[in-house]
Amino acid sequence: MAPSNLPPIFNATSQDIEMLLAAQCHLGSKNLQVHMDPYLWKTRPDGINVINIGKTWEKIVLAARIIAAIDNPADVCVISARPYGQRAVLKFAAHTGAAAIAGRFTPGNFTNYITRSFKEPRLIIVTDPRTDHQAIKEASYVNIPVIALCDTDSPTEFVDVAIPTNNKGRHAIGLIWWMLAREVLRLRGTIASRETEWDVVVDLYFYRDPEAEENKEIEEAKVPGAEEVGAAAIESGLVGDSWEAQVAPAFAATGAAVPAGAAPGWEAEAAGEWAASSGAAAGAAETWATDTAAPDAGVKW
């Protein structure tokens, strides 16, 4: 929690602290950069540096106040070259109106005015100072303030406001961006207070692997036993043991539509017609024999 000598606005709720701990925002790396030492709480026996969560919350509130002080939200540029933060910066930009650069940062975006992607933001926010070093370097050339999510081993050169947190985990990155967006909207008046539940869940800011999501959808849509039954049976709907239940009523309905005396009548008709046909054929054979024998009778050998 925040120290007692700070204003009450810096006090975080117990739910916020629990979310930060659950997302492992307090777990840093084994290396420690000298400028990140004030944000360190302790070092575990296994060498992992633990970050002070109270300091993390203070910097989130401070960064949100800086963002809210900018009149035009589009003058804020959020950047993430790290894949785990690309979805988060896009969601942050959608909810706050900022400009997002997700993926590779094109060199010259802030310095080369000839390029189509040239921007002149008043503030940039980066996910990782190490992977987004090109954006920070160009921002230093044109005097753009920088807010960065910094781990214990992150370089802090040209970083004006460092938010100490775990910037390598997908849940930690998504939660920090979500809290930052919620705090900005609270300062703008969109959200009444921190106690008011935001209708945007934090899961929307988490990274999702496209291939894993596609495979998951395929597995959910896949019919069990498709390899054994075959595609034709799946299209007809006769899969597994259900065909007996579907075929039996069909035969029953067909049999019910036929009158009870239809079977003997059919046999009788068929027998009569066959007998008549046989008799006609026999008569034809006798007539043919008579016709052929008649000329032979008058022939003298």
UniProtKB/Swiss-Prot annotation:
Q: Which InterPro entries match?
A: Ribosomal_uS2, Ribosomal_uS2_C, Ribosomal_uS2_CS, Ribosomal_uS2_euk, Ribosomal_uS2_euk/arc, Ribosomal_uS2_flav_dom_sf
A GO biological process this protein is involved in?
ribosomal small subunit assembly
Is Signal given among the entry's keywords? no
- Pfam families in the record: 40S_SA_C, Ribosomal_S2
GO cellular component terms, semicolon-separated = cytosolic small ribosomal subunit
Give the subcellular location. Cytoplasm
Q: Which UniProt keywords apply?
A: Cytoplasm, Ribonucleoprotein, Ribosomal protein
State a single Gene Ontology molecular function: structural constituent of ribosome
Q: Main site of residence?
A: cytoplasm
Disulfide-bonded cysteines: none
As recorded in UniProt, coiled-coil segments are: none
Q: Which domain of life is it from?
A: Eukaryota
Q: How does it assemble?
A: Component of the small ribosomal subunit. Mature ribosomes consist of a small (40S) and a large (60S) subunit. The 40S subunit contains about 33 different proteins and 1 molecule of RNA (18S). The 60S subunit contains about 49 different proteins and 3 molecules of RNA (25S, 5.8S and 5S). Interacts with RPS21.
> What NCBIfam families does the annotation carry?
uS2_euk_arch
What this chain does, per the record?
Answer: Required for the assembly and/or stability of the 40S ribosomal subunit. Required for the processing of the 20S rRNA-precursor to mature 18S rRNA in a late step of the maturation of 40S ribosomal subunits.
* Family according to the record: Belongs to the universal ribosomal protein uS2 family.
The protein's name is Small ribosomal subunit protein uS2
Q: Which organism is it from?
A: Blastomyces gilchristii (strain SLH14081) (Blastomyces dermatitidis)
